[in-house]
């Protein structure tokens, strides 16, 4: 095991802070949790500390906490575990979420490590969400399971998801998510083109979503038709 990967233990703690605005409304969220990086599971408990109750559906925040740290993804031996190897220095990501009704979320996350605890410093901006849409009306009910495709480009790792929220009364609310992952450590070996399958659920919440518990399972894989490249 490399020195970098050895700093990631079988169980890791999570401490996070999110500062954000939604259609101009300011809010802050703090959270703590733990997870098993090699198994691909983690759970966080979150609390709105400023700006609550939030004037929008909680679910658009879920990916910022859970999809937020790719160190909590199970990788098979034939997929290079690039972001675990970025520690102890850590990594950053920038994300855009384009919703079908014109709503837009722009998010950044700086992930660092102290001892056996990951710290997430998250900045969130939500814009252009229509007042009659499912987010402002709080009609979203959860995320479908998703598959993110990941590929290296110009020294960073790019992730794309065509995602969907379920809504009250049936149907879906579509969203395209793009994330750029950047290791702080130079000259890390990049993985090839691969996928990460994710299931994100809310385990518990109060009526106003002032306190929420989320759980995630995430597994990396190749496409079923994948064929390793042969050395020339």
UniProtKB/Swiss-Prot annotation:
The keyword Ligase does not apply. There is a cross-link at residues 66-68 (2-iminomethyl-5-imidazolinone (Gln-Gly)). Contains a chromophore consisting of modified amino acid residues. The chromophore is formed by autocatalytic backbone condensation between Xaa-N and Gly-(N+2), oxidation of Tyr-(N+1) to didehydrotyrosine, and formation of a double bond to the alpha-amino nitrogen of residue Xaa-N. Maturation of the chromophore requires nothing other than molecular oxygen. The precise stereochemistry of the tyrosine has not been determined. Pfam families: GFP. GO terms for biological process: bioluminescence; generation of precursor metabolites and energy. Pigment protein that is green in color. This is GFP-like fluorescent chromoprotein dsFP483. The lineage of its organism: Eukaryota, Metazoa, Cnidaria, Anthozoa, Hexacorallia.
